[in-house]
Curated annotation (Swiss-Prot):
Gene Ontology biological-process annotations: DNA replication, synthesis of primer
Phylogenetic placement of the source organism: Archaea, Methanobacteriati, Methanobacteriota, Stenosarchaea group, Methanomicrobia
Source organism per UniProt: Methanoregula boonei (strain DSM 21154 / JCM 14090 / 6A8)
Enzyme Commission no: 2.7.7.-
Keywords from the UniProt entry: DNA replication, DNA-directed RNA polymerase, Magnesium, Manganese, Metal-binding, Nucleotidyltransferase, Primosome, Transcription, Transferase
GN (gene name): priS
Protein name stated in the entry: DNA primase small subunit PriS
Short name of one Pfam family: DNA_primase_S
Subunit composition and interactions: Heterodimer of a small subunit (PriS) and a large subunit (PriL).
């Protein structure tokens, strides 16, 4: 941002913070805080951190006076959160955090990325509550203000977990390290055994959409599968599909084609299996000293609100409407390239150069580095 754009965005943030009803995390006095300031012309973002607040009024006053571009707090609880080094802080545990960010999931138009990452978030929440038995009252859901969602699990049972335990959990969520033999022998139970069977059934169904020559060519391209094995597999395709809905025939696990298919690291079956995982960002979950965005703050890279949500509200939540905090009054921006920007229920066609857009769109474009204020 140039200085004029920085000042424009900072003034909008200041206006928001003057009026907004801010919220603070639980156990405020045990949290470390970090702030990124508006710094026109800076080559990189620098964070002011190792700060603590005993009371929420002190925190809110600090934010309103400082007007930061980003606000973070620690998922960890510390004895001395404002100590200048991590070793001196005295770690007392950390919330279990999951980050679902479109950067790690899908590329494409912004609204389509947001839609896809919502689907991944819904899968994660279902796994946590229905499969792992975590009480939904212990889960806090937050739109990150950028390209995804943060899921905070406050349950004390997880607070003392180290990185290794958290990695095992996120690996389960993401379907990493699953054993095909165990899953196919898992019986008619929910969770990964059911997902594995479903993915295999979908794969076999997909084979049925190919011509006989096409199916043979595909199967014989798999490691260790010859023409005889492939032809035999195709003849008993219906029998195998029926078997996947009941108790597995032990001989199925020895089938050369099945073994080749389920041990592939990529391909048509693996693609279908991966779609059943929730694609959380593993480093965020395993980091027991992570800084995470403060709900109700503004994301300095988008100008949108870091929006806390009730779990039941996620299906109807539209970030490009519900997390927008700035007005529809018109401002002039100078865009670096043409684009279509969906926001506030409309799609704005923005040309390269000078355009007039709603303030909310203008703030977004400036924060993303797509435009300067004109």
């Amino acid at each position: 941002m140039n200085p004029a754009t920085t000042e424009f965005v900072r003034q909008r943030f200041a206006e928001y913070y003057r009026k907004a009803m801010l919220v603070s995390p639980s156990s405020l006095a045990q949290r470390e805080w970090g702030f990124v300031l508006f710094n026109p012309g800076a080559a990189e973002l620098r964070m002011r951190r190792h700060i603590a607040f005993p009371e929420r009024t002190e925190l809110f006053d600090y934010i309103r006076n400082l007007v930061p571009s980003h606000v973070y707090y620690s998922s960890a609880y510390y004895e001395k959160p404002d100590a200048p080094t991590m070793a001196e802080k005295g770690w007392c545990g950390a919330d279990l955090i999951f980050d679902l960010d479109a950067d790690h999931i899908v590329k494409g138009p912004y609204d389509q990325m947001l839609s896809r990452v919502k689907t991944e978030t819904e899968k994660l929440l279902a796994m946590l509550t229905e499969e792992l038995g975590i009480d939904s009252k212990q889960i806090e859901l937050v739109f990150s203000g950028g390209r995804g969602y943060h899921v905070h699990v406050r349950d004390l049972a997880f607070r003392g977990w180290g990185s290794a335990e958290r990695r095992e959990l996120v690996d389960y969520i993401c379907g990493i390290g699953i054993d095909p033999a165990v899953l196919l022998n898992g019986g008619l139970v929910p969770g990964w055994p059911a997902r594995f069977r479903s993915a295999l059934a979908e794969y076999i169904g997909w084979l049925g959409t190919l011509s006989e020559d096409g199916a043979m060519a595909h199967l014989t391209s798999l490691e260790g599968v010859g023409k005889e094995s492939a032809a035999g597999f195709l003849k008993k395709r219906a029998e195998i599909l029926a078997g996947l809905s009941g108790e597995i025939d032990p001989t199925l696990l020895k089938d050369r084609v099945i073994k080749a298919v389920v041990h592939e690291t990529e391909g048509e079956f693996r693609k279908r299996l991966n779609e059943k995982a929730a694609l959380a960002d593993e480093p965020v979950t395993t980091d027991i000293k992570r800084l995470i965005r403060m709900p109700t703050s503004i994301h300095g890279g988008s100008g949108m609100r870091v929006q806390p949500l009730e779990l039941r509200d996620l299906p109807d939540f539209d970030p490009l409407v519900d997390a927008v905090v700035f007005s529809a009054r018109e401002v002039r921006v100078d865009a670096r390239f043409p684009l279509a920007m969906p926001m506030l229920g409309s799609t704005y066609q923005i040309q390269k150069g000078i355009s007039t857009v709603p303030e909310a769109v203008g703030v977004f474009l400036c924060c993303r580095g797509i435009a300067e204020i004109a």
